Amino acid sequence: MEGSRPRILVGHLEPSPPAFDGELDLQRYSNGPGVSGTPGPGSPGMGAVGWSETRAGERRFPCPVCGKRFRFNSILALHLRAHPGAQAFQCPHCGHRAAQRALLRSHLRTHQPERPRSPAARLLLELEERALLREARLGRARSSGGMQSSPAAEGLARPQVPSSSAFRCPFCKGKFRTSAERERHLHILHRPWKCSLCSFGSSQEEELLHHSLTAHGASERPLAATSTPEPPPPPQQEPRSALEPEPEPEPRPEPDREANPAPTPAPPEEPPAPPEFRCQVCGQSFTQSWFLKGHMRKHKASFDHACPVCGRCFKEPWFLKNHMKVHTSKLGPLRAPGPGSAPARAPQPPDLSLLAYEPLGPALLLAPAPAPAERREPPSLLGYLSVRAGEVRPNGEGADPGGGRSYGGFRPLPSALPNRARRHRTEEPEEEEEVVEAEEESWARGRSLGSLTSLHPNPGEGSGQPAPAAGTQARSTATQEENGLLVGGTRSEAGRGATGKDCPFCGKSFRSAHHLKVHLRVHTGERPYKCPHCDYAGTQSGSLKYHLQRHHREQRSSAGPGPPPEPPPPSQRGSLQPQSGAKPTQASATWVEGTASTRPPSSSTGPGSRRKPASPGRTLRNGRGGEAEPLDLSLRAGPGGEAGAGGALHRCLFCPFATGAPELMALHLQVHHSRRARGRRQPRADTSPTYVRAPSGETPPSPPLEEEGSPGLSRSGEAGLGGQER
């Protein structure tokens, strides 16, 4: 069935000329039931003429080669690709033909490789494309002149007959009423570049320059397209386009040059004045003075704007303004220099290294002493730079003239000095440990006051004077007096709170003073946490703990209660090993630090009671009774240098853990070593005095693991103490 249908369709195509050498025109038979090759029952009187008229009305775009019609021009453009010799788009300059408009557009760029991308140029290109499209349509209508019978086809053929009173543009085929309008149109769109010596015009500046060199022998600057158009020539010089059968695609100015071989030379136009402001170094010109001023900064390293706080220099004033926010937001408005202050130093070229500004403003450190009227309240700038007045003391005493180095009445704290000024600290390790302890105590109180001076150690450390070895309270009081902190009040800049949280070296901000203290070790190179087994030294206690657990865990477990070969850092001195003079005895087993009695707190209930023992926080502490205080599990060095009240340091039997609180040891055993503690029968030789040693021949009691074990622990302690008394 499918083989018989093409034969029938071919029979219907016999009256019309064959297309594509006998190929089937399937598009003719896909128009619906109304348009068909065979008249249907709905159209009994439809003949060949009616069918052709309906088909021509629906398909207005015929192919100029084969006569095939299409509904849309885009389909016709795709169809024209099948004809290799028929190209619808022709170049007006060289006659090149292209099947697609995009290909012709790319070809037109070869004639104008350096065409300026101006609005007028884009409009000219668009007009040329419209002219090409119009020519293509007229060519198709002209080729199918006899076949067009519809009014739409006649409308396409009407533009071929120009009116006698119209002036056409030779480029875009535009019609104008008068010749002046056409000349104005040519000057704006097609001939923006006019020769001032003759009537030559061009659409490109290069063509006008070439014309000036060849015809007139002088290169003069052409008139821009925005200049005032010249008056149009008289109408008799321009031939009427209505008398011409075909308008010329491009005018030829050669006859004009031959007619005027020797024109009178006009005075050459003066070149436009160059920009007023020119750089004397590179020759670049500018239209405004401030452009040249900003450009001249590139040729010289001018750092005219210096920071009065840290000494950094900037090229622009707004850079300095933004930089000053770092200081003013923390210090408040800077005060004017007093009469005794030294004159400002001249700005110097900045150093790229931040280490060059380690002293933080040598001009301020070397400044003379302030006037006596200004010594009542230390300025906030000195607090920011870690500089303390050498003669101002809260207790009214004067500064020691030989206690340390002073620069003009101001003594810089050791953290503001270079590293080489602190090398003598290693010669006195004992004094350094005591000073660090005082520093840690001052941090706990200085953090609430928000003072930067509590960050630094005692100035007596840098001068070689030993710190007082009194109790904790006396040491912290002395540290506050040295740093300028009153017991009953605060300093003037203590209310600012954020003064001591900025690094004076790099300007970084930190949330707490401890983080700033750890960060300052990066600049100072200080590594206070040293390993007792090797040469490792760290800036943080956590680094040393990790190092000891990773590399020296076996050495720590086998070391026993003996002292290490080298004193550990202050953060772990009281938690890793006891003092050399401390010996584990039964009498030193105390439950609470500072308890007068050597007996552990007995339970309020009987031995068989299952109630919990009394809370450790309600026991006596420091000889004071009737107070409910929380349990203090921290370790502090007593007046005699012992860890805890009696020097008791409780060590775990199964791991290197050590603590001064028996409750914490019991909790540690319950959490980590409950099963191992139950199966343990023989204690080690260095058993901690936390649990009283049982008489010979008896099994030592297990540590308190549950609530039932608490009374047992009390009974064992009572039995041990009773045996000792007997």
Swiss-Prot record:
Natural source organism: Mus musculus (Mouse)
Where is this gene product found?
Nucleus
The cysteines covalently paired via disulfide bonds are none
Segments of skewed composition (Polar residues) = 473-482, 572-589
Superkingdom is Eukaryota
The record's section on PROSITE patterns has: ZINC_FINGER_C2H2_1, ZINC_FINGER_C2H2_2
Query: Could you tell me in which tissues this protein is expressed?
Result: Highly expressed in primary chondrocytes, heart, pancreas and testis.
Keyword DNA-binding annotated: yes
**Gene that produces this protein:** Znf219
Described purpose of this protein according to its UniProt entry: Transcriptional regulator. Recognizes and binds 2 copies of the core DNA sequence motif 5'-GGGGG-3'. Binds to the HMGN1 promoter and may repress HMGN1 expression. Regulates SNCA expression in primary cortical neurons. Binds to the COL2A1 promoter and activates COL2A1 expression, as part of a complex with SOX9. Plays a role in chondrocyte differentiation.
Q: Which molecular-function annotations from GO does this UniProt entry contain? A: DNA binding; DNA-binding transcription factor activity; DNA-binding transcription repressor activity, RNA polymerase II-specific; RNA polymerase II cis-regulatory region sequence-specific DNA binding; zinc ion binding
Q: Which family does it belong to?
A: Belongs to the krueppel C2H2-type zinc-finger protein family.
Zn-finger (C2H2-type) residues? 61-83, 89-111, 167-190, 193-216, 277-299, 305-327, 501-523, 529-551, 650-672
Kindly indicate whether the keyword Repressor belongs to this entry.
yes
Q: Where is the composition biased (Pro residues)?
A: 262-275, 561-571
Q: What is known of its domains?
A: C2H2-type zinc-finger domains 5 and 6 are important for the interaction with SOX9.
Return the protein name: Zinc finger protein 219
Which GO BP terms, alphabetically? Answer: cell differentiation; limb bud formation; negative regulation of DNA-templated transcription; positive regulation of chondrocyte differentiation; positive regulation of transcription by RNA polymerase II; regulation of DNA-templated transcription
Residues with Phosphothreonine modification: T699
